[in-house]
């Protein structure tokens, strides 16, 4: 019985010395062409889903962001990249989590909304407004000669004839070879949810120098100037279009040129992946200390990508100060004698 095969994943390795045996994941399989993708690639494998928080379940920093600055994060693992390039952005751009209507997009609890107040003015050729996710080690692990990656997502817009573009960057890390653009496509959105697929052809890694923290960057472009049109498969500029909403749901990136069906992760698994890069530790309290020379205490947390940047916010009483930070814990110090209350929160940032 023939089985469906997915091209370009290169999971089927044929041992020509034995024509009836296929080596698959270092194990011999009989009957040659066996490659049932959903069975053999777990959701945890980057080849199956390299996007983190593709179902927009995790929002540790908040649920609504009004006029976020370029480089700031919104939903976990997503950040804004904005270059007005001499123009004026719409007076209000809001990024928010919205509740999905059951049955509209199967398996989605939430979706990502960008609400725009007006079209903005005066954008030059180099202007852009993107929503970005960076995939850690994505260039090293997913890119190369003859390799492709496929992004799939649902989208809609209440703005008539609004376009959305998708493209990528192959980044070799700090001190590595120059960044390379992976040209994609653009789509004209309707008011109904539609699924869209974009396949990016990646570049050869031969002769390239890798620095620290190589990444594959995936960009959802909401506005672009004429100088940036080619990278989303267009030849003209695209403005914000006017007042209205742009909605995005169920973002996925698969290795190869096939958009596999979206499979939501368990929330606990998705949260754990997000917390490798950022974690918000809710209110903690230390009370009734009497140590004039100071007290050092430790807070443990889920291991981070690197030792995080720590932001301490005092809720009540005396604020602790940071003594040291490690990938899975921080040491804090209280130096005032006779402390009756120290209530605080911690933000731990280890983003790329």
PLM features: what roles do these ranges have?
Residues 1-41:
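Extracellular "spike/adhesin" assembly and maturation modules
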Residues 38-352:
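Extracellular and organelle-lumenal recognition/adhesion modules and their flexible linkers in secreted
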